[in-house]
Every structure is written in C-alpha cells, then in structure tokens.
C-alpha cells in the first residue's frame, strides 16, 4: 500500500469575473466528485458558498499566514487577469503549504477547480522522483526558444505535484522574485505583450 497523497483544491468565489454574478460554479462539484472516485483524500480550501461540496472542506481564510501576507504586500499584477484572479493563482500555494504543514503531509497534488482527475495520485510512481512536477508543453523546451527570449517558456500548475519542501522553496522563490527582482518582472511584462 502506498502513502496517501492528498488532492488539494482551492476555490474562493471572491470578486472573480468568471463568476458572472453567481456565488459558485457548478463545475467545482464535478471536480471534487471526480477526484474522490480515484483518491482517498480530497481537500477543498474554500469559502462559505462551497462548504457543502466536499467532505474535507476547510475555510481558506483559516490558512492565511505571515508568509502569504509578506507575498501579498510585494505582489504586482503583471497579467491581463483581474488582480483578484491573479492573486488567487499564487494564494493557493501559500494556503496549501500551511495546510500541509499543520496536518503533517509530506506531499500533495494541486488541481485547478475545473480539472477532472482520472488518476489515483497516491499510486502514480513518477511523483516519487521529484520535488515539483507540473505540465509544461514539450514544444516549449528552452533549446527551442528564440535566443534571448527565455521568458516565453511557461508551465501550468493546474495539475501539479509538490513535496512540502518543494512548496516551501517555491513560495520563497515567489516572494523573492516580487520583492527583489523587479528588473526580471519588467522584462516578463514586456515579453508578454
């Protein structure tokens, strides 16, 4: 029997533009139900509007930490997304790290709230060989990029694996990038246009 790896979902309605005036989207129910078909532990860090949708629901605000507050203070939205949405992309990593540390988990899989999971992540052997795994399209290999334009490379964390240590290092990296490397972030914005 393998060690249980929790599947983590973060979904707060907040001011998200895609909510179209609704408090929650129906797809979240399907995301949770599908993940539970294959996985023993599925956790939702959510808000009062989705409390009934997952047996292992936790109020996301209970996992706000000093580390998140530090990141939030230096965060600058460089995307075309509304700021609340862009912050949420990063916020989940900080909240999930706190959940893992409080509950003594050594690893997790994080999925977006609109992902349908057809895998028992606890039995997926390739995760045993890394600290972090995320979807990166093959045709975006660094060697295939235009010279001097490495910022076009991107990775999607909509289905990602982290050890707790890997998530600590990633959130430290996020704080450092926004606090101390404005030059790189300015180049990101220029390349992204």
State what each model feature region is.
Residues 79-85:
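Surface-exposed cleft-lining segments at the edges of enzyme active sites
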């Amino acid at each position: 029997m393998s060690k249980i790896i929790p599947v983590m979902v973060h979904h707060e309605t907040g001011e998200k533009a895609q909510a179209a005036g609704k408090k929650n989207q129906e797809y979240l129910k399907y995301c949770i139900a599908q993940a539970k078909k294959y996985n023993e532990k599925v956790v939702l860090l959510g808000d009062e509007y989705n409390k009934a949708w997952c047996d292992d629901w936790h109020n996301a605000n209970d996992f706000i930490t000093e580390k998140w507050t530090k990141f939030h203070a230096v965060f600058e939205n460089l995307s075309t997304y509304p700021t609340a949405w862009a912050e949420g992309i990063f916020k989940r990593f900080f909240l999930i790290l706190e959940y893992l540390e409080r509950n003594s988990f050594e690893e997790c899989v994080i999925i977006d709230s609109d992902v349908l999971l057809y895998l028992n992540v606890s039995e997926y052997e390739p995760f045993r060989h890394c600290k972090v795994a995320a979807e990166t399209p093959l045709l975006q290999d660094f060697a295939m990029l235009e010279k001097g334009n490495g910022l076009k490379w991107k990775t999607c964390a909509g289905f990602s694996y982290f050890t707790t240590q890997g998530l600590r290092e990633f959130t430290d990296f996020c704080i450092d990038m926004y606090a101390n490397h404005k030059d790189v972030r300015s180049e990101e914005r220029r390349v992204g246009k």
